[in-house]
């Protein structure tokens, strides 16, 4: 799949993905169709069918592979906005849906702009891992069950708002970190140093060694605070903490190999930014 994106003319991926993301987000116009006489489900089905037909008409592989993913995420974002403004107990879930779709789309867009050489369909992170998928499904199931049997729990607006602020903070920090790192940022931990790889210690990297992980850490926990999911909130916190503990150690082994004393000095001066995580231990 990574090879598909490579055959798209360089520089066009960002424009293509943005155009089709906005196309999918035009589902926001669906209420106008229902006012015109179409029933909600009928209008939605016709809209989805129309989107698919348009994408098939306009694009061929590999551009279609990018377009369908970006359009899907735009569609999910639009549905999230509609749900957010609905008069139901699911409006906070709409916030979550918007946050989730924006996270995945922005990962691709920023990579396309910032480091196109590393860009692939995997940059959407839609197939991140089985564990990631299970975690997401678990949070949806918990929200649904608690919304049915304990609906008042899902209407603690101040708590959901606090979770939304955590999500916004985490998302912004991660994207700033990606832009600051530039071509040095990669979704995959590198085992070999490229000729252009440099150690970034400025900007947000002067505050913490792993700002992109810090952002993702608080974003992940914030989604569950937003949903008022007590069970997944605790499980997410423990799971992502352990994941980033192992991930920082794995990455720092490579960074020490790449940059030697330069990274060791940086490591002494600047914390990881993640709570109770110090990174790989270096023997004296």
From Swiss-Prot:
The keyword Metal-binding does not apply. S-adenosyl-L-methionine binds at residues 190, 197-200, 205, 210-213, 251. It is a multi-pass membrane protein. It is found in: Endoplasmic reticulum membrane. This is Protein-S-isoprenylcysteine O-methyltransferase. It catalyses: [protein]-C-terminal S-[(2E,6E)-farnesyl]-L-cysteine + S-adenosyl-L-methionine = [protein]-C-terminal S-[(2E,6E)-farnesyl]-L-cysteine methyl ester + S-adenosyl-L-homocysteine. Its EC number is 2.1.1.100. One of its GO terms (molecular function) is protein C-terminal S-isoprenylcysteine carboxyl O-methyltransferase activity. The chain crosses the membrane at residues 17-33, 42-59, 70-87, 93-112, 132-149, 155-174, 213-228, 230-244. Belongs to the class VI-like SAM-binding methyltransferase superfamily. Isoprenylcysteine carboxyl methyltransferase family. Its main location: endoplasmic reticulum. GO terms for biological process: bone mineralization; CAAX-box protein maturation; determination of adult lifespan; fibroblast proliferation; in utero embryonic development; liver development; methylation; multicellular organism growth. The gene is Icmt. Keywords: Endoplasmic reticulum, Membrane, Methyltransferase, S-adenosyl-L-methionine, Transferase, Transmembrane, Transmembrane helix. Residues 1-16, 60-69, 113-131, 175-212, 245-284 are cytoplasmic. Substrate binds at residue 247. Signal peptide: none annotated. Pfam families: ICMT. Catalyzes the post-translational methylation of isoprenylated C-terminal cysteine residues.
């Amino acid at each position: 799949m990574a090879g598909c994106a490579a055959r798209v003319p360089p520089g066009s991926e960002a424009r293509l993905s943005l155009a089709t993301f906005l196309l999918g987000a035009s589902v926001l116009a669906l209420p106008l169709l229902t006012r015109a006489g179409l029933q909600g489900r009928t209008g939605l089905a016709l809209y989805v069918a129309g989107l698919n037909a348009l994408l098939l008409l306009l694009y061929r592989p590999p551009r279609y592979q990018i377009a369908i993913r970006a359009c899907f995420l735009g569609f999910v974002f639009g549905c999230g906005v509609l749900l957010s403004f609905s008069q139901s107990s699911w409006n906070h879930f709409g916030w979550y849906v918007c946050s989730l779709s924006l996270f995945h789309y922005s990962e691709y867009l920023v990579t396309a702009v910032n480091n196109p050489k590393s860009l692939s369909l995997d940059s959407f992170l839609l197939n991140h891992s089985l564990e990631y998928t299970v975690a997401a499904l678990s949070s949806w199931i918990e929200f649904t069950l608690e919304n049915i049997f304990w609906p008042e729990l899902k209407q603690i607006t101040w708590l959901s708002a606090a979770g939304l602020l955590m999500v916004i903070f985490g998302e912004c920090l991660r994207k700033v970190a990606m832009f600051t790192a530039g071509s040095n940022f990669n979704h995959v931990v590198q085992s070999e140093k490229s000729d252009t790889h440099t150690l970034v210690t400025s900007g947000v990297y002067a505050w913490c060694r792993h700002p992109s992980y810090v952002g993702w850490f608080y974003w992940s926990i914030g989604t569950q605070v937003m949903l008022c999911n007590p069970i997944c909130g605790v499980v997410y916190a423990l799971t992502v903490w352990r994941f980033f503990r192992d991930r920082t150690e794995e990455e720092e082994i490579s960074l020490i190999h790449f940059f030697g004393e330069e990274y060791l000095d940086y490591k002494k001066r600047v914390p990881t930014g993640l709570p109770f995580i110090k990174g790989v231990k270096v023997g004296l």
